[in-house]
């Protein structure tokens, strides 16, 4: 008979920006859908019976909405079928956790995306890390065999219009 092993409970990440981190610092974030592997974000019109504007279009529009209203500053957002990667600067108040939570709640309620409860974040400490994560994000669909070149991938929001505001 197999014994049940108690797995460690993963700590909930605080997603707070420490006071010593400069305003306008970039964060690499990953938000996963559940269940893993199910394409919720990258369906195209005509595929799988999709006839309306796609969820992916709506997710990127919601990202753009928050960017244009200074809720956050998005440098790059790329959708994969079951997750997204983004590089975003957040205001200290209401902060990263609240901004992401509210955005996920809106997208889930309006467009039916099933998000994983939490998300991953990593502060990008210098220009080298920023370039490294930008390349990683843009190459993700190529590595997964979804397109041949990064510029062929449709599901990208990259405004590159200004530096993060000083909130």
Enumerate the language-model features and the residues they cover.
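Short catalytic/metal-binding and nucleic-acid-binding patches
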Residues: 1-167
């Amino acid at each position: 008979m197999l014994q049940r092993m108690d797995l460690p409970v993963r700590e909930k990440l605080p997603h707070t920006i420490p006071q010593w981190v400069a305003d306008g610092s970039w964060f690499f974030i990953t938000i996963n859908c559940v269940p893993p592997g199910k394409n919720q974000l990258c369906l195209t019109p005509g595929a799988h019976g999709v006839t309306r504007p796609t969820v992916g279009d709506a997710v990127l529009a919601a990202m753009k909405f928050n960017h244009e209203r200074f809720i956050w500053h998005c440098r790059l957002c790329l959708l994969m079928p079951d997750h997204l990667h983004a590089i975003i600067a957040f205001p200290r108040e209401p902060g990263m956790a609240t901004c992401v939570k509210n955005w996920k709640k809106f997208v889930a309620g309006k467009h039916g995306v099933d998000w994983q409860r939490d998300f991953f974040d990593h502060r990008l400490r210098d220009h080298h890390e920023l370039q490294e994560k930008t390349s990683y994000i843009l190459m993700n669909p190529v590595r997964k065999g979804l397109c041949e070149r990064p510029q062929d991938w449709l599901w990208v929001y990259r405004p590159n219009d200004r530096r993060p505001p000083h909130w």
